[in-house]
Amino acid sequence: NMELTLALKNNIGEINRLHSFIEEVGEVFALPMKTVMNLNLVLEEAVTNVIMYAYPKEEHEYIHLTAKEQDGKLIFILTDSGKAFDPTQAPDADITLSADDRQIGGLGIFLIRKIMNEVKYERIDGKNVLTLEKEL
């Protein structure tokens, strides 16, 4: 059972490494280009949320991402040891507002829910664990 993992520093500069990882996931699981693009959007949003909300500015910690296929679903598990932050509790974006007036994070979870089939947040052993599933 194939499983790919990535460790990112909690730094926005790491987003390029995230994109490379998603492309690798796309190749390994033979995903259509559109799916890869959507996954890039979703994971960038999820990782950015962690960087912005879960960690104090100067704390150097890692964010771990695992991708695997199970029962016809692609599953991403994003884990960090930052402060508790449940992105699924962020209000959905008010899409009638201009981008500047929207709350940070709101559009993100709206987008994530739209693209992924299942989104689940848990706090386990002092860690944030976000599980994102997409049916293949």
Which positions does each model-derived feature cover?
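Short helix-loop "hinge" at the ATP-lid/N-box region of the Bergerat-fold HATPase_c
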Residues: 50-55
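A conserved short beta-strand within the histidine kinase catalytic ATPase domain
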Residues: 60-68
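Helix-loop-beta hinge of the Bergerat
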Residues: 3-33
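Flexible, glycine-/charge-rich segments associated with ATP-binding catalytic modules
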Residues: 1-7, 12, 113-136
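Glycine-rich phosphate-binding loop
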Residues: 101-116
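Glycine-rich/acidic phosphate-handling loop/turn and adjacent ATP-lid/helix
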Residues: 76-104
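Conserved short strand/loop->alpha-helix "switch" segment adjacent to the catalytic nucleotide/phosphoryl-transfer site
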Residues: 22-44, 101-103
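Short beta-strand-loop-beta element adjacent to the nucleotide/active-site pocket used for signaling
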Residues: 68-76
